């Protein structure tokens, strides 16, 4: 192996390590912002972050997503509610992955907040699944559980819509930073 090949491999390893550390920091950032914003029930930046990271890092955006989910479990305790986080947040990642990568900006400015709001609106129903299984709810009881939390889901949707307006500008900034840093 030549010296140039060794240097090239070393640079590639450094780049991958930097990217992994950066994605880990993003997961911690998600968790920290959720704690700071906890005074506002169901209003947070998590959906926005997941969408921005997915647009910029594609499948690697699952790293900060699951770091966030794991930190939530450690901080608040691993309970029935936490099980839903294992699929509810990655669902937003999956929906974002399915969106066209090259949407016109005007379309993206409308689509991203709507997707974020929709995810916030259905979040309670997604969380009802493990609750219904764990507590042996009937279908009617599950619907009642969802209905009881609907006001929180509407709040979640409104917050997600507002923060969803930042998805496109922040993803453009992140792409520019990635391009200029040459480390990611």
Describe these PLM feature segments:
Residues 2-56, 60-68:
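Hydrophobic transmembrane alpha-helices
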Residues 60, 85-95, 155, 159, ...:
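Core segments of alpha-helical transmembrane spans in multipass integral membrane proteins
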Residues 31-44, 67-102:
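Interfacial aromatic-anchored transmembrane helix boundaries in multi-pass membrane proteins
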Residues 82-83, 105-184:
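Membrane-embedded alpha-helical hairpins and interfacial helices in multi-pass inner-membrane proteins
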Residues 21, 25, 29-32, 67, ...:
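Lipid-exposed faces of alpha-helical membrane segments in multi-pass integral membrane proteins
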Residues 55-58, 95-104, 170-178:
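Structural signal for the C-terminal ends of transmembrane alpha-helices
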């Amino acid at each position: 192996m030549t010296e140039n090949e060794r240097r090239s491999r070393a640079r590639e390893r450094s780049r991958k390590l930097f990217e992994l550390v950066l994605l880990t920091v993003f997961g911690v950032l998600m968790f920290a912002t959720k704690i700071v914003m906890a005074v506002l029930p169901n209003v947070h930046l998590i959906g926005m972050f997941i969408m921005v990271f997915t647009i910029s890092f594609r499948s690697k955006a699952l790293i900060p997503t699951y770091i966030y989910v794991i930190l939530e479990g450690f901080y608040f305790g691993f309970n029935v509610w936490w099980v839903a986080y294992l699929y509810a947040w990655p669902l937003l990642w999956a929906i974002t992955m399915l969106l066209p990568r090259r949407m016109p900006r005007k379309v993206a400015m409308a689509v991203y907040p709507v997707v974020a709001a929709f995810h916030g609106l259905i979040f309670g129903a997604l969380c009802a699944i493990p609750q219904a299984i764990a507590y042996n709810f009937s279908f009617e009881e599950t619907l009642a559980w969802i209905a009881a939390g609907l006001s929180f889901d509407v709040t979640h949707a409104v917050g997600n819509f507002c923060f969803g307006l930042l998805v496109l500008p922040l993803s453009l900034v992140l792409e520019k930073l990635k391009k200029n840093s040459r480390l990611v």
